[in-house]
Amino acid sequence: MAVVAPTAREENVYMAKLADRAESDEEMVEFMEKVSNSLGSEELTVEERNLLSVAYKNVIGARRASWRIISSIEQKEESRGNEEHVNSIREYRSKIENELSKICDGILKLLDSKLIPSATSGDSKVFYLKMKGDYHRYLAEFKTGAERKEAAESTLTAYKAAQDIASAELAPTHPIRLGLALNFSVFYYEILNSPDRACNLAKQAFDEAIAELDTLGEESYKDSTLIMQLLRDNLTLWTSDMQDDGADEIKEDPKPEEKN
């Protein structure tokens, strides 16, 4: 029996998985971009969608962490009056910000040109619109002035569009709907400095999911309850922060592989 050669799409998906195992995040992004760009009007499978999300989350996550560390060092050196060090740090921070901008621009372009227009199901529409909101939010984390305002407005627009579809088409316990609520509430808290709205959104999502927990299927039970726990963690943190100035880590929607 003749062996059927894998298609270019299958080969790129396999190579993306290989790059993931090898922790070669940039290459993983490249392979999944090839898959996305080769589809025409066809949609990515759930597996492909998750691989793309993981690839970009790994690449952006490392640089977001670097930016936070460097910004913290910059503040300390500024308070000590070490101008020479501050100038060097600013140059380095600027380099990281350029990399962050490039990564965000890359995935946002792919989302607008391919992924969002070809999405047909409710969960894929919400998935990609949430992703669009996430990457505009990452831009808002470090941009300033008019650029920050623009990034924040784009985040809000994408999250609201995703929320409208999620409310109409996805169950309150659906992990994608819960992940959207988690990240949307983080946006209100961190970018818009609106703890009340952040807490209200997170609490509503948590309460609605709790009310329907008995209808949750076995396959998404683990994913959904994990995100519900993260919503509760943030609510606990934010309500205590309103009373004192805590500095614990705010939780965001984990990568698909972290839910397993």
From Swiss-Prot:
Pfam family, one: 14-3-3
Lineage top rank: taxon: Eukaryota
GO biological process annotation, one example: protein localization
GO cellular component: cytoplasm
SUPFAM superfamilies from the UniProt entry: 14-3-3 protein
Quaternary structure annotation from Swiss-Prot or TrEMBL: Homodimer.
Family: Belongs to the 14-3-3 family.
Name by which UniProt lists this protein: 14-3-3 protein 3
Organism of provenance: Solanum lycopersicum
Lineage: Eukaryota, Viridiplantae, Streptophyta, Embryophyta, Tracheophyta
